Amino acid sequence: DTVFLQYPADEYFLRDDYVIGMDAEKNHGLKSLARQLKDKGYKIGIITSASIDHATPGGFYASQPDRSMYYEIGVDAANSGFDFFGGAGLLEPRSKRNLSAPCLYDLFNQKGYTMFRGMDAYNRAAAKDKILLFPTDTVSKSLKYAMDRSAKDLSLPDLTKACLANFQETAKKGFFMMVEGGKMDWAAHAHDGGAVVKETIDFDQCIRLAYDFYKKHPNETLILVTADHETGGLGLGNSDMNLNIDLLQYQKCSQEALTAAMREMKSGKMIPSWKDMKAFLKKNLGFWEQIKITPREELELLVCYEESFLKKKSKDVVSLYAKDEPLAVAAIALLDKKASLGWTTKTHTGAPVPLYAIGKQAVLYSGRRDNTDMANVLRKLFLIK
């Protein structure tokens, strides 16, 4: 995964994508490009819509034999000295393997970090160095999906803008930022086409912020946009030559939010009738109103509703990052089908991913490149051996 973007192939041996920042035998830690730049005096920012100790952000600062060692990855984050961490907080602030180990929030504090919950708290403060910027919600494992959040919820563009503004003021030598639209991957694992689109648009806002900075500093800036892999095997076209992507505009919330709402209905004193459920699907997905639903399709939804709400026999549909209500999954799958989207897998694929570059020496990234070239070329640009 992302770790290949951080380490040369001769160090990492392209062997185990569950390892973060270690050699193939898991005996020695390796130094990522970001850590090498930190040693040279650059400011470093790590931004994600997942938690900051997840595999992708962790690949920029951690050295651990397994990506699921969230507490240990968090310790590496605190010890990294990186200047700005923004995301959904920490998955394991207290160690599950060593109960006497310190709380990570205390450790970050000891290392000189200031933590803020939400943009209001951050904007009111004067702190400029060693920032942690997390949501006000202390429970969630990720930022809210773009289509689910309110104006007060922390967003990936918020974090990008805050980090960029901070570094413009404080970075004397220069800076390196990594911004991950992690929820795109989560939505694709769950086959939620509407959420994928909205997360991509949200990520585009982050690119716009970086591009605006580039226009002011064209001779000092390099922007790279890529992915560590494709997820879900998303394809356009599933039955005929027509695409109906515009139907996704009627999806008002993510599959995750649909699941939460349906579970709340289930837990109430009165189980919603099929008529009530149809009204719910009409409001949130446009079914029977903007989107035509055939009698056969309605029957399939009805059977799913009865199994889940009346007979209570159905089990959650499990994907990598979610356990969703079967009716929510069936409804989103129907919408995706009508929008002409097709999926081939619930996991990652080997499909080539795009690489876009603009700015200083961007030509070095032209053509078809191996993923380890991402770090190798940057090392040459920064004169790192």
Residue ranges and their predicted role:
Residues D1-S68, F82, A357:
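Active-site nucleophile/metal-coordination loop of metallo-enzymes that catalyze phosphate/sulfate
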Residues V3-L5, R15-I20, A62-K385:
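A post-motif C-terminal structural segment
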